[in-house]
């Protein structure tokens, strides 16, 4: 017995413009699509329920192709600093925070909104009795107070390879940590099986409410023993209908493989070895070929020495793994592309270029010759556009987030959020991809790089499943595919500009069953 969904604009995303009015779902699969009358007659004895979609629009359910699920769940339970405009008020809020441990944590501050970069002295003025950490929105920079420095064992002469410790005018540590220096924080703030499971449940509930039913995630380094984190996934995905694809951080890959922990489970599997080549534009740690426009003495940070980076790629190949690399600056992309050319992926597989934020024509031409996935976050463009002009200048900024050029190379373009760094709201990702404007309103940046709405939607639906080899039954709304879909009040294909951001999600459905409902649409 099944459910007949009728009176909808049901977009298959199998090809542009293909839309059906009704579909019959049974045992979690789409049995048939077409006109309501025909389906009523064909399945007359098997229709248990009829759902009237009331003219709403239906799309395949979304997959976030770049997220940190455990970290996102943690952030939902911590002080949200993303909208903070006054540092002292933020710290006073943090001072009242209750926690299971003694660290006081705030997530996602933006020094541009605060009007200043926090330092340990500023934090000490409000909270000096407990260790405090403020994580910048990019999560490549964090600030701790004096207690935090003490807890991390950081002293004046400490040197961090692949990272940096901020200093004041007198050369003393000012509490600002960059890139690899944050690894010490991860160890201090690490979770366990129970805590990580709670974070996962919190994250998945939130994702369902955004139409997201699957994710490509990277969590195994930051939250304690990677084997316990894998156990947390087993606990949660044994009870929640969510599909996860786990990348494996290079610092834990040996342990995970030695314990034979990468066996595919029903609702999650494992992918490439993840590594970082550089940092972020916001922290001026993305690796550039020319200096930052607003800091001529800075070109960014190499997280790994070139010989170490090469050794990591060789290690992945020894393990028979693909490589997924965080590369934002053009110099970082060039380093990684050179290594992929030197150590090609196994035939029939693809490496993953994460972010690929700043690309000249030469790099795009080289990428065209490689079997790669482009792991893109269109929301970054709209979040950061004003800052990008500051960091890169008026000319170089036109080479950022070249989505259309990358798609035209034949590379598989994936849409994601990098939450908790940016919002999981897919509407924001679609807006960034098709409008290429700031959320605050601006002219279009390099309009030739805009995606069509069809291309943008596919990057969040079908393409993520192609990347993981699960596209035979997922990512489209066609006969025999899993009945995973979202129902929206308005039609994304008719919306322009900011109207995209205001479309309302009515329902998220997994295997034919609602997992989120904003309103009852059953008649």
What would you call each of these model-derived segments?
Residues 2-7, 11, 15-26, 30-257, ...:
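Divalent metal-binding segments
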Residues 6, 26-27, 277, 481, ...:
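A cytosolic small-molecule/anion-sensing beta-strand core signal
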Residues 97, 206, 466-467, 515:
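Short alpha-helical functional segments enriched in proximate histidine and acidic residues
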Residues 237, 260-268, 367-369:
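Acidic (Asp/Glu)-rich catalytic clusters
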Residues 268-285, 372-382:
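Non-cysteine beta-strand/loop elements that form the S-adenosyl-L-methionine
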Residues 314-324, 331-351, 356, 361-365, ...:
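His/Asp/Glu-enriched, well-ordered alpha-helical/loop segment
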Residues 517-523:
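Glycine- and charge-enriched low-complexity intrinsically disordered segments
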């Amino acid at each position: 017995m099944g459910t007949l969904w009728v009176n909808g604009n049901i977009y298959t995303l199998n090809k542009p413009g293909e839309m059906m009015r009704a579909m019959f779902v049974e045992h979690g699969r789409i049995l048939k699509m077409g006109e309501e009358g025909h389906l009523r007659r064909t399945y007359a004895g098997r229709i248990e329920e009829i759902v009237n979609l009331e003219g709403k629009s239906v799309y395949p359910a979304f997959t976030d192709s770049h997220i940190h699920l455990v970290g996102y769940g943690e952030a939902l339970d911590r002080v949200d600093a993303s909208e903070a405009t006054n540092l002292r008020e933020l710290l006073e809020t943090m001072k009242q925070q209750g926690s299971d441990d003694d660290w006081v944590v705030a997530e996602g501050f933006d020094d541009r909104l605060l009007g200043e970069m926090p330092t340990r002295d500023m934090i000490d003025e409000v909270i000096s009795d407990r260790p405090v950490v403020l994580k910048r929105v990019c999560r490549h920079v964090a600030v701790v107070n004096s207690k935090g420095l003490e807890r991390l064992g950081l002293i004046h002469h400490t040197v961090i390879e692949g990272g940096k410790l901020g200093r004041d005018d007198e050369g003393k540590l000012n509490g600002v940590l960059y890139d690899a220096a944050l690894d010490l924080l991860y160890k201090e703030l690490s979770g366990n099986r129970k805590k990580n499971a709670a974070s996962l449940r919190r994250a998945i509930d939130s994702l369902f409410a955004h139409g997201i039913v699957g994710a490509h995630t990277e969590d195994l380094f930051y939250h304690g023993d990677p084997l316990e984190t894998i156990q947390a996934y087993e606990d949660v995905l044994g009870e929640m209908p969510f599909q996860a694809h786990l990348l494996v951080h290079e610092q834990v890959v040996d342990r995970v493989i030695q314990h034979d922990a990468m066996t595919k489970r029903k609702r999650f599997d494992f992918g490439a070895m993840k590594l970082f080549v550089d940092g972020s534009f916001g922290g001026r740690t993305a690796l550039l070929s020319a200096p930052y426009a607003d800091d001529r003495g800075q070109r960014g940070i190499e997280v790994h020495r070139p010989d170490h980076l090469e050794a990591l790629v060789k290690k992945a190949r020894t393990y028979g793994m693909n490589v997924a690399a965080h590369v934002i600056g053009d110099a970082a992309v060039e380093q990684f592309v050179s290594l992929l050319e030197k150590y090609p992926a196994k035939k029939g597989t693809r490496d993953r270029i994460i972010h690929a934020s700043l690309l000249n024509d030469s790099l795009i031409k080289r990428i065209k010759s490689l079997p790669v996935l482009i792991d893109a976050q269109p929301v970054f463009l709209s979040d950061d556009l004003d800052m990008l002009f500051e960091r890169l200048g008026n000319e170089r900024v036109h080479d950022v987030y070249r989505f259309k050029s990358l798609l035209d190379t034949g590379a598989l373009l994936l849409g994601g959020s990098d939450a908790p760094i940016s919002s999981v709201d897919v509407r924001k990702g679609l807006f960034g991809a098709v409008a290429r404007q700031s959320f605050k309103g601006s002219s279009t940046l390099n309009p030739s790089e805009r995606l069509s709405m069809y291309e943008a939607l596919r990057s969040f639906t079908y393409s993520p499943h192609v990347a993981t080899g699960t596209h035979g039954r997922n990512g489209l709304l066609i006969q025999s595919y899993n009945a995973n879909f979202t129902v929206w009040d308005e039609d994304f294909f008719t919306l322009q500009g900011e109207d995209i951001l205001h479309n309302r999600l009515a329902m998220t459905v997994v295997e034919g069953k609602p997992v989120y409902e904003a309103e009852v649409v059953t008649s």
